Regions:
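Enriched for short, Lys/Arg-rich terminal
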Residues: 1-3, 12-25, 61-92
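Short alpha-helical linear motifs
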Residues: 30, 50-54, 69-73
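Residues that form or immediately flank small-molecule/cofactor binding pockets and catalytic motifs
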Residues: 9, 54, 85
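A short, surface-exposed loop/turn module that caps and links secondary-structure elements
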Residues: 34-59
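N-terminal first-folded block
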Residues: 9-41
Length: 92
């Protein structure tokens, strides 16, 4: 089990999304629970990103949205960084 936190940017996005699309927020919460309940070997199944995002991993939420997160295996800590449309995440 991992400890976790959300970035300030992600907290804002989830708060806004809660007003517009509660179902997507429920899906995000389900993915967060899935990730933090993983063990160290299972967390490696999530895709590592490349280039300037290489310190992040990602998981798809719904069909076109991505939740990015950073894992510190030594501290057993996950920082959820961003949630956005697939095209906007990768255009950075």
């Amino acid at each position: 089990m991992f400890e976790f936190d959300f970035s300030d940017e992600l907290k804002t996005k989830i708060a806004l999304l809660l007003k517009r699309d509660k179902k997507r927020v429920e899906i995000i919460n389900k993915k967060v629970r899935e990730i933090i309940s993983s063990d160290e070997a299972a967390i490696s199944r999530y895709k590592n990103l490349r280039r300037e995002l290489k310190h992040l991993k990602r998981v798809h939420v719904d069909r076109n949205f991505v939740l990015t997160f950073q894992v510190d295996l030594e501290k057993k800590f996950v920082l959820f960084v961003d949630f956005d449309h697939h095209d906007r995440i990768y255009s950075r």
